[in-house]
Design a protein with these regions (language model features):
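Short, well-formed alpha-helical segments that are part of the catalytic scaffolds
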Residues: 17-32
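Conserved donor nucleotide-binding strand/loop of the catalytic core
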Residues: 39-42, 53-85
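Conserved sequence signature across two-component system core domains
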Residues: 14-15, 44-46
Length: 237
């Protein structure tokens, strides 16, 4: 195994989250410091058009934080970009979103389950979704089951711990511009028989700001993710 400097690199993609991003970063610093981990936080701003960028830049000189400001490419490509940086920094990579719908204080539950595993994937309990979003989630779960023999309960959750050595292998087959890379990663982990542990997490509706997806947008993006998943499945054994 490669000799890596850090225990974990936390990848947080962000776009137009001026009301939440500062609180999100502060919470992650608090949690990781309390666990005495050797860590790095990667904040990747995907070309925000509000005050998010200026808030993120304030953390540029903070110890254990890297801030990356890049042109807008979308959530998926931003996750992949973060993963590709993170695998060279730490033994484990953790991905979280910046909306605080899953509190960072739940990270320790996944971290303690990592021993002997290649990935620890959260699953959201009591998730209050609209009918349309519930349908999109169901289709994603069925598609990964059919294409990858994946039985994970929450294939697209942005609260996942991945061993860098394994993630590096998967990233070789997932396009840099992937629209929904986490779904493909969930499927590939299962298909290639890596050791996966699931961990329930509490999901909270966001209290400030707005979700970037309407029901119609969720349907369109769900369809796009499905076609991409079919294509990606062909490059895995």
């Amino acid at each position: 195994m490669r000799k890596l400097l850090k225990d974990v690199a936390v990848v947080i993609p962000v776009f137009n989250e001026e009301e939440l991003i500062g609180e999100c970063i502060d919470e992650w610093l608090k949690v990781l410091n309390s666990m005495n981990l050797h860590y790095e936080i990667l904040i990747i701003d995907d070309g925000s058009s509000d005050a998010t960028t200026s808030i993120v830049e304030r953390y540029g000189d903070t110890q254990n934080i890297q801030t990356i400001i890049k042109p807008n490419e979308g959530h998926g490509p931003t996750i992949v970009a973060g993963y590709k940086r993170a695998v060279d920094i730490a033994e484990w990579v953790f991905q979280a979103d910046s909306d605080n719908e899953i509190n960072p204080n739940q990270f320790s539950a996944l971290w303690t389950k990592r021993h002997g595993k290649d990935a620890v994937i959260g699953w959201r309990q009591d998730r209050n979704q609209t009918t349309v979003r519930r349908l999109v989630t169901y289709v994603a779960r069925v598609a990964t089951k059919v294409l990858f023999r994946c039985h994970l309960r929450d294939v697209n959750i942005p609260f996942r711990l991945l061993r860098s050595e394994i993630l590096t292998i998967l990233l070789e087959r997932i396009p840099s511009n992937a629209f929904a890379p986490n779904i493909a990663i969930s499927g590939a982990l299962s298909l290639m028989n890596y050791q996966i542990e699931e961990c329930p997490v509490v999901f909270n509706e966001r209290t400030v700001g707005e979700s970037s997806l309407s029901n119609l947008a969720a349907l369109r993006k769900g369809g796009r993710a499905l076609f991409e998943l079919i294509k990606i499945s062909r490059v895995f054994p």
